Amino acid sequence: MKNKKFILFVLVPVFVHMFLFSVGPIIAGFGISLMDYNPLRDSNTFAGLKNFKELFADEVLVKALFNTLMFVGITVALNITLSLMIAQFISMFKSNKIRSFFRMAFFLPCVAPLVASSVVWARSIFPTATGLANMMLKTIGFDPVNWLGDPNILMWSIIVFTIWVDIGYNIILFSAGIDSIPTNFYEAAEMDGASAWHKFRHITLPLLGRTMTFVTIMTLISHFQMFAQFSVMVLKSGPQNSGLVLTSYIYKMAFEIKNMGYASAIAVLLFVIIFIITIIQQKIQKVDWDY
């Protein structure tokens, strides 16, 4: 009886917090998306599916959706590939001190606030005249690049920054997954004369199935929701809306144009996209075995 009371004592605050700050806002967002809602008005009218119908005719939304899918697709693919390669490289060292050093070094950017890191990159690395990136290009004979002002380069600049700031978290997860694989699998493979590539391909990669699923889903969700770097680095959606993504468009519609009903409809669209991709990802990477 005491154990049940303790469990309730621990779980009830968690569920209350989850409902107030997760489930509640989602339900409220669905409700607001069906209204012509402006917080500055005394009364707001029910609009039905009007906001959702406008989604299909909004060319700016189409551009934001394209930018979002491009950003997420490239960053997630590069993030997972590079973090797995780096984690595998770190696991090759026998010394725990060396492995811990590399893990700490790669994880440090994750500790800094994302807004602060975005400001540092925007003001110290990417500026056309005085930025570190262009200074390095000049030393090897290349012309300076307008990293945050060229519509063809802006998104790639943010992709590079996002990978730098976010890759350390997945390196830690993959390193933990690799360390948990029993060494007898590798010992048996060495006795059979397997190369390092074959051990990675036929042992490490398959046995990281659950870790890979978790990392992929969490990275997808977090990158779909990223907002800080676009808010800091991109000036007014960027040239030709090249830096506009769904999260920044939601913010613009809700807090600049004050059309929260339409902003909520875009948020519902983003929620549906994330939900569908997560379900598909779970089906594709489903793992039914254990070791």
Locate each region found by the language model.
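A structural signal for multi-pass alpha-helical bundles of membrane permease subunits
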Residues: 3-291
